[in-house]
């Protein structure tokens, strides 16, 4: 893609998100969502093939439906409040419709079907934007309207997302689909704590973006899109492959890695709010995610057969030059659990 066109598209994506995050006028928020959606579609179709076109079409229809529901909720709220500004929702129907619209944009269950399909059909770089940056705007609006959200509706969708994020990834060999199901599960964890402690949602979002960005950057370096291709990388780039597997385990929430921190804090916060059954179910269901990450780790690193490496040494080290940029990301996404005592400021 032409660098000038790419810079314009990226600027529009960033501008659309910033408009949503900084506006208190519902029409401007809707416009920000539309700018963001229309700008990212060329990014999804960066590679001209039928799969990318299909993925972009699915993304467009889903986001357009969500935008339509969002505008419907805004109009219903306008009828009861008489104003476009302010984040307070005056009608329970408007609150429910807006929650459904925003969760559809996020990819929460039962509106999760588009996430794996779109992620599988697009390049890794576009998948990184889709699963990280594109979550900021809907989560910001959910954060702002959290006092008016129906608690039981959001908790039901959160629990369903965590369960589907675990079950859906069990039989997958495509790494992009695995990352998509991981995204669905993480969104479930974020929205489960949103009403009780919105600040903890932001902590979870930051850690999720760090881990997902690190994972996609590693996959882009070793050009792996399936578990089979990842296992072949072991003899070529052992360091990159090892870090990739550790980052995967961190995404699954295995202690003592960084990914365990938000799960620990969320379960603790839910327990403080006299919720016992929900965090228990969430913890049990999170084991599904950890299982398929462990399976990838086992298949990639623990079942290697003896081979000789015929690759030239120079070729081996060509791809490690990008590690300088990755080093802080890797540290943050795997080794920040000792910072847990500092998180008491969130309570």
From Swiss-Prot:
Enzyme class: translocase
Reactions catalysed according to its record: a ubiquinone + NADH + 5 H(+)(in) = a ubiquinol + NAD(+) + 4 H(+)(out)
UniProt topology in membrane: Multi-pass membrane protein
Stated family: Belongs to the complex I subunit 2 family.
Subcellular location(s) of the protein: Mitochondrion inner membrane
Cellular component per GO, a single term: mitochondrial inner membrane
Keywords recorded for this protein, A-Z: Electron transport, Membrane, Mitochondrion, Mitochondrion inner membrane, NAD, Respiratory chain, Translocase, Transmembrane, Transmembrane helix, Transport, Ubiquinone
Positions of transmembrane segments: 13-33, 59-79, 96-116, 127-147, 148-168, 178-198, 201-221, 237-257, 274-294, 325-345
Organism expressing this protein natively: Cheiromeles parvidens
Keyword Mitochondrion on entry: yes
Disulphide linkage map: none
Domain of life of the organism encoding this protein: Eukaryota
Subunit structure, as described in the record: Core subunit of respiratory chain NADH dehydrogenase (Complex I) which is composed of 45 different subunits. Interacts with TMEM242.
Entry EC number(s): 7.1.1.2
One of the record's GO molecular function terms: NADH dehydrogenase (ubiquinone) activity
Functional description taken from the UniProt entry: Core subunit of the mitochondrial membrane respiratory chain NADH dehydrogenase (Complex I) which catalyzes electron transfer from NADH through the respiratory chain, using ubiquinone as an electron acceptor. Essential for the catalytic activity and assembly of complex I.
Predominant location: mitochondrion
Cleavable signal peptide: none
Protein name: NADH-ubiquinone oxidoreductase chain 2
GO BP annotation list: mitochondrial electron transport, NADH to ubiquinone; mitochondrial respiratory chain complex I assembly
